[in-house]
Amino acid sequence: LHSLRRRQRQMCIRDRYASTAKLMSQLKISKAKGTILADLKRIERVDLMILDDFCMQPLDAQSRGILMDIIEDRHQRRSTMITSQIPVKDWYDVIGEKTIADAVLDRIVHHSLRVELFGESIRKRKSKSENAYG
């Protein structure tokens, strides 16, 4: 992910990285403050939005609505990269509410290029090598 972001910057592609859970929390606060439309507009305009750790925890009603807004605003206009350790088949349950889950997943899954990575995580490998020399 870091190498990809570095390459995008070399190509002058504007990106924004966010942990999905943290982004939802920030946008809930901006909704309470009345600034969510401006924040969503900034997300909509970025060339590549990276949502990391997608579907790691169930979404509440407000987060579902915000996620739907983000995906709908960006759908077929701008690129969105989603990383997750949760299998795609389980995203439906994590998103919850059938109508929104259908709409979000239809836009994400059916118009995407999927790259599945297998094997040990880099963090785990780095930790082992640091402990071996530590």
What are these regions (language model features)?
Residues L1-I13:
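Single conserved hydrophobic/aromatic residue that forms the stacking wall/gate
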Residues R5, A38-D47:
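Short basic/glycine-enriched coil/helix segment immediately N-terminal to the Walker B
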Residues R9, V46-D47, R78, S112:
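Short, well-ordered alpha-helix to beta-strand connector turns
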Residues R14-L23:
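Short beta-strand-centered segment that lines the nucleotide-binding/catalytic pocket of NTP-utilizing
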